[in-house]
Amino acid sequence: MSTIDKEAVKLYLMQLQDQICQRLEQEDGKATFIEDAWYREPGDRLGGGGRTRVMRDGNVFEQGGVNFSHVQGNAMPASATAHRPELAGRRFEAMGVSLVMHPHNPYVPTSHANVRFFIAEKEGEAPIWWFGGGFDLTPFYPFEEDCQFWHNTAKEVCAPFGADVYAQHKAWCDDYFYLPHRGETRGIGGLFFDDLNQWEFDKCFDYIKAVGEGYCDAYLPIVERRKVTEYGEREREFQLYRRGRYVEFNLVYDRGTLFGLQSGGRTESILMSMPPLARWEYSYEPQADSPEASLYQHYLKPREW
């Protein structure tokens, strides 16, 4: 059985943050990430630190953030113990990289990725650990070929780890990024997994590496294809309207957001995923046979790619 190596995970996650930031800056060609390094004394409700990096007003990206954090606490918050009661009363460490990119152009999808590691320990008992993460895509004006490329890349990421991994983690993504009050998915999905510890530590660690590095391979070719597509006020207004769904999901359902806020995490870093602008419109209905209607009819429901 392979040994749990927290330091190796932390080092890798910091390197992954660097690598992703570099590739996104290259794609944007103008904006750079501004780093806000932060630290909290262990005596706080949630101690630890991180590197919040935010990009604004680029050629391609209106706003985006790539966060690394490593925090420790003496008790897990309710959002974590609700489905894992055995964690109650254990001290814990959580570390991860989380990112969201909001492009200017409505034809370029919003994207999100996350890889994380949790370990909960109690004296005299074996540690409870797991990995989690994934990546998902939220197009406003989707192209079939882009969606297929995104999911084919996800399949390639999963293939070395088992024949059924993609299907399982795709289905989990479809279920997780679903807004029950709207009756629709947030986007076209991708991969999502949590509580990953059924393999040995090293294999689980290798899987989050593949997912973390697969994000740019899946996303940047789509950005490259769509970033020069012409658009007007109609497309921009629809993009802002659909960004409202992103806000609704993150504030109402997202376990990472809830965990961070309930455990006394750093609010600015937790809410980094919010879009810079969004809008709501009462009782909106897309025009029949329009590109906007196509999004609802063909893409905001689970399907095989």
Curated annotation (Swiss-Prot):
Main location: cytoplasm
Catalytic residue list: H112 (proton donor)
PROSITE patterns in the cross-refs: COPROGEN_OXIDASE
Location in the cell: Cytoplasm
EC number: 1.3.3.3
GO cellular component: cytoplasm
Cofactor(s) essential for the protein: a divalent metal cation
Keywords: Cytoplasm, Heme biosynthesis, Metal-binding, Oxidoreductase, Porphyrin biosynthesis
Catalysed transformations (reactions): coproporphyrinogen III + O2 + 2 H(+) = protoporphyrinogen IX + 2 CO2 + 2 H2O
Binding residue positions for a divalent metal cation: H102, H112, H151, H181
Site residues, Important for dimerization: H181
List of residues binding substrate: S98, N114, V115, R116, G264, G265, R266
InterPro entries given in the database record: Coprogen_oxidase_aer, Coprogen_oxidase_aer_sf, Coprogen_oxidase_CS
A GO MF label: protein homodimerization activity
Source organism, top-level taxon: Bacteria
SUPFAM superfamilies, A to Z: Coproporphyrinogen III oxidase
Important for dimerization: annotated segments: 246-281
GO biological process, one term: protoporphyrinogen IX biosynthetic process
Pfam families: Coprogen_oxidas (PF01218)
Subunit structure: Homodimer.
Family assignment from sequence similarity: Belongs to the aerobic coproporphyrinogen-III oxidase family.
Task performed by this protein: Involved in the heme biosynthesis. Catalyzes the aerobic oxidative decarboxylation of propionate groups of rings A and B of coproporphyrinogen-III to yield the vinyl groups in protoporphyrinogen-IX.
Protein name per UniProt: Oxygen-dependent coproporphyrinogen-III oxidase
Gene name tied to this protein: hemF
